[in-house]
Regions:
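N-terminal alpha-helical interaction blocks
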Residues: 13-169
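Short N-terminal helix-initiation segments at or just after the protein's N-terminus
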Residues: 121, 146-154, 190-195, 303, ...
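Cys/His-clustered metal-coordination modules, chiefly Zn-binding fingers
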Residues: 162-289
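Hydrophobic, glycine-enriched assembly/anchoring segments
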Residues: 277-307
Length: 307
């Protein structure tokens, strides 16, 4: 197995107006997401708000685990990614998994409490096997409701690893292959157009596992690379009464060539838009675009279809 250090000899040459290809996750990413989930739950008038509130609690627990534990970097791989998501279950997984289950005690309803009790009863070998099935996308029907906590624990570990890297550590992807995270290889859940002073107007894809971001040209479809058939679609308030505020920033970036779409969020419309959290608060957009014949690109680890 080829590995390399976290600080290679070859550095990216950065000019005065350098636009970083890759952005490491913020150290308070889970705390910020917890606040966003709480806001979205308050804005939601349906029964879905309870699930958004649960995810806020889980994100708070993620931040606590992120702050509490140390996650030494594993050997970094050469090639298209440096921290491949399909690798073995990380050493810190069981500790974080237990932390998250314990942190939700007393903050959830009876159904969730019953589910976490089942997960707490798993042996270390059973929990590790469950995580391995989820990492390798070989889940079984009984695994579905457990995925929330497993995915949340895996996010903490991979995010902690990614936060220790710099742009120099991460391979630059070709323009034709920018739907997959160059850090861990996970497909982007969506993208965000930033309003950060030095990066205003730039589109960055967002990884749902390691929470890093990487630049992709706005003029091209991130899935097939075509630049001729891109459309931005949106659910407008005039067509849907009492539309949740999150929809103001959410767009479906659809492609007439490959008939896929991926969600994009404009921070100039909602400065706290989070591609993981806001995705779950704007599912009406997915329904509308799906009914128009487009296939979604990018999975959200917290969107459990069919459960």
């Amino acid at each position: 197995m080829n590995t390399r250090s976290a600080r290679p000899d070859g550095k990216i040459q950065k000019g005065l107006f350098h636009t970083p290809f890759w952005l490491a996750p913020e150290k308070d990413i889970f705390a910020s997401r917890a606040v966003r989930f709480k806001e979205l739950a308050q804005e939601d008038s349906s029964g879905w708000s309870g699930y958004l509130s649960l995810l806020s609690v889980i994100c708070e627990a993620q931040q606590a685990a992120f702050n509490r534990h140390t996650f030494p970097l594993p050997p970094l791989y050469r090639g298209q990614t440096v921290l491949p998501a399909a690798a073995e279950v990380p050493d810190g997984f069981l500790t974080v998994f237990t932390d998250l289950l314990n942190a939700t005690d007393g903050q959830t309803n009876a159904a969730v409490t019953a589910e976490t009790a089942k997960l707490k009863a798993l042996t270390a070998a059973e929990a590790t096997a469950l995580a391995r099935r989820i990492l390798t996308q070989q889940t079984e029907p009984p695994d579905r409701t457990a995925e929330i906590w497993v995915q949340a624990a895996l996010q903490v570990v991979w995010t902690a690893w990614a936060a220790q890297l710099s742009e120099d550590d991460v391979p630059t992807a070709e323009n034709s292959d920018r739907i997959f995270c160059p850090c861990c290889g996970t497909e982007a859940v969506g993208s965000v157009i930033l309003i950060r002073s030095d990066l205003t107007g730039f589109r960055y894809m967002h990884c749902p596992l390691c929470n890093s971001r990487w630049n992709a040209l706005r003029a091209k479809c991130p899935t097939c690379g075509d630049a001729g058939g891109m459309r931005l679609q949106q659910v407008e308030e005039k067509s849907v009464p009492h539309l949740a505020p999150a929809y103001s920033a959410a767009h479906a970036e659809s492609c007439e060539s490959c008939h896929t779409y991926r969600k994009l969020y404009r921070q100039d419309k909602q400065q706290y838009a989070d591609p993981v959290a806001d995705d779950l608060a704007t599912l009406g957009l997915d329904i509308a675009v799906g009914e128009a014949g487009y296939e979604r690109g990018g999975a959200n680890p917290f969107l459990l279809i069919g459960t």
